Swiss-Prot record:
EC class of the enzyme, as a word: hydrolase
Principal localisation: secreted
Catalytic reaction annotation: Hydrolysis of (1->4)-beta-D-xylans, to remove successive D-xylose residues from the non-reducing termini
Pathway: Glycan degradation; xylan degradation
Recorded name of the encoding gene: xlnD
Protein name: Probable exo-1,4-beta-xylosidase xlnD
Organism: Neosartorya fischeri (strain ATCC 1020 / DSM 3700 / CBS 544.65 / FGSC A1164 / JCM 1740 / NRRL 181 / WB 181)
Length: 771
């Protein structure tokens, strides 16, 4: 920790700016049994959360308050308040970050590494998501209790994956707002151990609020990008996951993003942070706080040029509702801003009370023996059950994109394993990762499966050299079957780095093409979060099978070979659209519009119909027959639907109906089946009409050959409604069609009619007239 003297006009503030991680340790939990802190009401467990937090803040000097508005808060030694680092990460397992400290060996040197969210999204399994989050929070709490992490984690990333070029799409569960909304609801439920619990296990942080999905594209960078978004698109596409997270799942923290939204930097935007988030969604309970992304407060001044001075940037963010700075603008300049009268002490106190209320709820100031989570420790990290769950999650997410009955592989024999992922380890984790105890490589898994393996890398992810081709082709000629493992990795897509193309990088397709001409069965295993154009592989009859595996993490190799060998049948579905390569020439990444226009083709499966592979696509090793029950659907009346909604439930979350379909396994292989229910209309509400909209889904487990399974899909009123130009959520009368997309060209439909008058389910707050 460096001690820095900073003079701001009349006030001299001693800033404690941390230059390295500040981690908790068991002996630096606050001592409420003796010492100066014990004399404050913050240690009185009989009092309410806000009163306890306010007593601590009131005991601080102005200087101490300002010092503790940064992510690596130095605490207040005078009061016995220890340092605390608010920045811990756990996107798909406890991850390396300033607040997390892994040991070099032994206890706390690793944690369970689950698949990246993009692959978790492909499972379409809400129960699984909650189970994964429960394990992650348990392990995160263990690290926190041991002084190796904070008790809050800056996860999940719930910006819908709008454009395949975005470098951080791998961190999200996909492109569909309903899907992402359900994902985050169950994830937060698992992380915090309940919906709005009084005593959360850990605090989750939904990010990045809002309309953030650009890193560095053709010279446009996230630190200065102004996302121009219509009110309709904002309400319909960009905000629903955050509404689910804040209003419905009652997350304890939200992160505002780097970008500006319609001219106002997100962390300086009271319309976003106050009007929509805290007021309209009623996200205003004790312990609910907002952090800026790391450097986002500085961007208000340096990137967006929104204010003339950094002091103005600090005050503007604080006044807008940002409580914590992941940076140093708050601690360096709030003193100057106070001198200039740019904010009130009441506003500063409010931010700090929010932050410390969160720690009070976490039991940070309570006796260890009174806290249910303080006993969690190393014994609870990477348990056999956690490892099994990591394996299950990877298997469930894998998507079969092509198969001419080559899969499952029928014999052991000799297997040529070729490609840059053939023996990959850390590559399979994606980003925001932590060290796992082990990583099962494809090479390891192939050997364990009993194959005589001939392993040759052949090429690298983005290589142009063909020096390794001959060895790869030689190995393939000696094998009974060839498995090529490639795609993209974090050298191609990453935070701070968007793609400019969506083709296979380097010379990988050239090598695959040459392998396909040898005459041996060829299976391609495609890694990566963002999709690449697979047209040439799908059309090549000598590429016999194609799998997409995302970033499967520590169990990647074994999970993939479970699918390849038929130990488990594939049932994952693409959580995004796979666009043709030329799509990037039709619309810039900076264009935030979803609907097609005179110069744009439209985005996502709802508005674009020329996909190489559509959202929700996924093949199986068996066949399924889908049928609707023998009953009429509807008609429904808008007034009746609205009037029967429970008073204590937001009307858009109220039930519309539960639809029953019958799924019959007509093949010979036991398999899961993901039922995706889409809605279409051609006359309900104003044009243009989306091609279709996902309104519900469920994953039916282990349907045996010949078995008929009744599957229920619940649909909410909000899913039936459409978003008007002003952002209102409106239930329109008209004719509707339900479509079950089974991914294999079977689209059973059912129709119904909604009668009555238009009904507004949610009146969206209108932006200020100046925007």
């Amino acid at each position: 920790m460096a001690r820095i003297m900073s003079w701001h006009y009349g006030k001299a503030i001693t800033l404690f700016v941390c230059l390295g991680p500040v981690a908790l340790s068991l002996d630096t939990f606050p001592d409420c049994s003796s010492g100066p802190l014990s004399k404050l009401a913050v240690c009185d467990t009989s009092l309410d959360v806000t009163t306890r937090a306010r007593s601590l803040v009131n005991a601080m000097t102005f200087e101490e308050k300002v010092n503790n508005t940064q992510y690596n808060s130095p605490g207040v030694p005078r009061l016995g308040l220890p340092a605390y680092n608010w920045w811990s990460e756990a996107l798909h397992g406890v991850a390396g970050s300033p607040g997390v400290e892994f040991a070099d060996s032994g206890p706390f040197s690793y944690a369970t590494s689950f698949p990246q969210p993009i692959l978790l999204g492909a499972t379409f399994d809400d129960d699984l998501i909650k189970q994964v989050a429960t394990v992650v929070s348990t392990e995160g709490r263990a690290f926190g209790n041991a002084g190796r992490a904070g008790l809050d984690f800056w996860t999940p990333n719930i910006n819908p994956f709008r454009d395949a070029r975005w470098g951080r799409g791998q961190e999200t569960p996909g492109e569909d707002p309903l899907h992402v909304s359900r994902y985050v609801y169950h994830l937060v439920d698992g992380l915090q151990n309940g919906i709005g619990p009084a005593n959360p296990k850990v605090v989750a942080t939904c990010k990045h609020f809002a309309a953030y999905d650009l890193e560095d594209w053709n010279g446009v960078v996230r630190h200065s990008f102004n996302a121009e978004v219509s009110t309709q698109d904002l309400s319909e596409f960009y905000l629903p996951p955050f509404k689910s997270c804040a209003r419905d799942a009652k997350v304890d923290a939200v992160m505002c993003s780097y970008n500006a939204l319609n001219g106002v930097p997100a962390c300086a935007d009271s319309y976003l942070l106050q009007t929509i988030l805290r007021e309209h969604w009623k996200w205003d309970e004790p312990g609910h706080w907002i952090t800026g992304d790391c450097g986002a407060i500085d961007d208000i001044y340096n990137g967006h040029n929104y204010t003339k001075t950094p002091a103005e940037a600090a005050a503007t963010a604080l006044n807008a509702g940002t409580d914590l700075d992941c940076g140093t603008v708050f601690p360096k300049y709030l003193g100057q801003a106070a001198d200039e009268g740019l904010y009130t002490n009441k506003t500063l106190d409010k931010a700090l009370v929010r932050l410390y209320s969160s720690l009070v709820k976490l039991g940070y100031f309570d006796p260890a023996e009174d806290q249910p989570y303080r006993s969690i420790g190393w014994k609870d990290v990477d348990s056999p059950a956690a490892e099994a769950l990591a394996h299950k999650a990877a298997v469930e997410g894998i998507v079969l994109l092509k198969n001419d009955k080559t899969l499952p592989l029928k014999a052991k024999g000799t297997l040529a394993l070729i490609g840059p992922y053939a023996n990959a380890t850390k590559q399979m984790q994606g980003n925001y990762e932590g060290p796992p105890k082990y990583i099962r490589t494809l090479l390891w898994a192939a050997t364990q499966a009993g194959y005589d393996v001939k392993y040759v890398a052949g090429t690298a992810i983005n290589a142009n050299s063909t020096a390794g081709f001959d060895a790869a082709l030689s190995a393939a000629k000696q094998a009974d079957v060839v498995v090529y493992a490639g795609g993209i990795d974090n050298t191609i897509e990453a935070e701070g780095h968007d793609r400019t193309t969506i083709v296979w990088p380097g010379n990988q397709l050239d090598l695959i093409d040459q392998l396909s001409k040898i005459g041996k069965p060829l299976v391609v295993v495609q890694f990566g979060g963002g999709q690449v154009d697979d047209s040439s592989l799908l059309s090549n009859p000598h590429v016999n099978a194609l799998l997409w595996t995302g970033y499967p993490s520590q169990e990647g190799g074994s999970a993939i070979f479970d699918i390849l060998t038929g130990k488990t049948a594939p049932a994952g579905r693409l959580p995004v659209t796979q666009y043709p390569a030329d799509y990037v020439n039709q619309v810039p990444l900076t264009d935030m519009a979803l609907r097609p226009g005179s110069n744009t083709p439209g985005r996502t499966y709802r508005w674009y119909d020329k996909a190489v592979l559509p959202f929700g696509f996924g093949l199986h090793y068996t066949t399924f027959k889908i049928s609707w029950p023998r009953r009429a659907l509807g008609p429904y009346d808008t007034a009746a639907l609205v009037s029967r909604s429970p008073k204590n439930v937001p009307i858009d979350r109220a039930a519309f109906d539960t639809f029953h379909i019958q799924v019959t396994n007509t093949g010979k292989t036991t398999s899961d089946y993901v039922a995706l229910l889409f809605l279409k209309t051609i006359d309900a509400g104003p044009k243009p009409y989306p091609l279709k909209t996902l309104v519900g889904y469920t994953r039916a487990k282990q349907i045996k050959p010949g078995e008929k399974r009744s599957v229920d899909i619940k649909v909410s009123l909000g899913s039936l409604a459409r978003t008007a130009e002003n952002g209102d959520l409106v239930l329109y009368p008209g004719r509707y069609t339900l479509e079950v997309d089974v991914g294999e060209n079977q689209y059973p439909t059912a129709s119904f009619t909604v009668k009555g008058k238009e009904a507004i389910l949610d009146s969206f707050p209108q932006p200020p007239e100046t925007r």
